[in-house]
């Protein structure tokens, strides 16, 4: 009985995990696809190049390593076994796309730091193509480390096709430091500097003071507020969310890379899908929370929705309008001498009826 109950609990946990993983997959595809369309249709966004790159990386991950995590046999969530060549391909994709995502997030944070802190120094900002070329070069090198790891086990044994379960061999600590520790430090430095600049601007006193009247409202405005206002609170929201999301999604995966392979393999499915949830969180964190992106999305949505036909409003003809029209007809040279009096008489007959209606 206990064995059956334990089996049912395990099956229930597996089913719930599979449903949550499917929701993460669907959210990553829909969110990044929508944000990519908005960015491509609105090229005047300041960080459009980095946003589009992040969406492309997330969509690549949602089309490659996330379905493998859903369908592949344990340590994945499915039951489809992978042959050695597919196992090596899965290792390479995981080892390359995860650093491309984390380094892309760090590049986006640094770009926003330069736009906010140094807005009038465009020469201090490197070209986005150069930055993203460096990101993909580093991701390709980190992906190549997976090819230097131990070969996959033969088919009778369970194939370990991930970075956590021995896929990198002795290179796992180096991969974790470059894929997670370095982007985390860059992101923390960028958003920390943004927060300090915003807080310093909030603490700065106003340049000029306006003359106040001697009214009661003016005197009451000198009173301190009942609740102390936290200076820089709104400016701290975006950095806190960005750093918090990065730490919540990627810190468990990075710590598992530094743990022994046996302990990392035990928590591989949970830690992997917590990291994959970042692909679904990026469109909301770096898209919908940004006011220019929200405005562009609303504008495109209004254009896409069908517009209701405008109702035809009946125009009421008043007496002054009829008289003005009568004068225009008298002055119109196109009308002949016989046509103008006839139309004048017809308009004159309509005038009493309109005046009675008014």
Curated annotation (Swiss-Prot):
Can you say where in the cell this protein is located?
Answer: Cell membrane; Endosome membrane
Q: Which GO terms describe its molecular function?
A: arrestin family protein binding; G protein-coupled receptor activity; identical protein binding
Its Gene Ontology cellular component terms are: endosome; endosome membrane; plasma membrane; receptor complex
Effect recorded for residue 111 to D: No effect on constitutive activity; No effect on protein level; Does not affect homooligomerization
Please provide an example of a Pfam family that matches this protein in its UniProt record.
Answer: 7tm_1
In this entry, the parts of the chain located on the Extracellular side of the membrane are: 1-17, 75-89, 150-176, 256-268
Residue ranges annotated as Cytoplasmic topological domain: 39-53, 111-128, 198-234, 290-358
Reported consequences of knocking out the gene: Deficient mice show any abnormality in growth and behavior. Both male and female are fertile.
Chain segments annotated as transmembrane: 18-38, 54-74, 90-110, 129-149, 177-197, 235-255, 269-289
Glycosylation sites per record: 3
Name the InterPro entries for this protein.
GPCR_Rhodpsn, GPCR_Rhodpsn_7TM
In which tissues does this protein get expressed? Expressed in the brain and testes. Expressed widely, in the brain, including the cerebral cortex, cerebellum, hippocampus,thalamus and pituitary gland. In the testes, expressed specifically in the germ cells.
Keyword vocabulary terms for this entry: Cell membrane, Endosome, G-protein coupled receptor, Glycoprotein, Membrane, Receptor, Transducer, Transmembrane, Transmembrane helix
Topology with respect to the bilayer: Multi-pass membrane protein
Segments carrying the region annotation (Disordered) are: 334-358
GO BP terms: namely: adenylate cyclase-activating G protein-coupled receptor signaling pathway; ligand-independent adenylate cyclase-activating G protein-coupled receptor signaling pathway; positive regulation of calcium-mediated signaling
- Record PANTHER family: G PROTEIN-COUPLED RECEPTOR (PTHR22752), G-PROTEIN COUPLED RECEPTOR 62 (PTHR22752:SF11)
What function is annotated for this protein?
Orphan G-protein coupled receptor. Constitutively activates the G(q/11)/inositol phosphate and the G(s)-alpha/cAMP signaling pathways. Has spontaneous activity for beta-arrestin recruitment. Shows a reciprocal regulatory interaction with the melatonin receptor MTNR1B most likely through receptor heteromerization.
Family, according to the entry, reads as follows: Belongs to the G-protein coupled receptor 1 family.
Subunit structure, as described in the record? Homodimer. Forms heterodimer with MTNR1B. Interacts with ARRB1 and ARRB2 in a spontaneous and agonist-independent manner; leading to the internalization of GPR62 in the endosomal compartment.
**Comment block on domains:** Lacks the conserved DRY and BBXXB motifs. The restoration of these motifs affects its constitutive activity.
Protein name stated in the entry: G-protein coupled receptor 62
UniProt organism field: Mus musculus (Mouse)
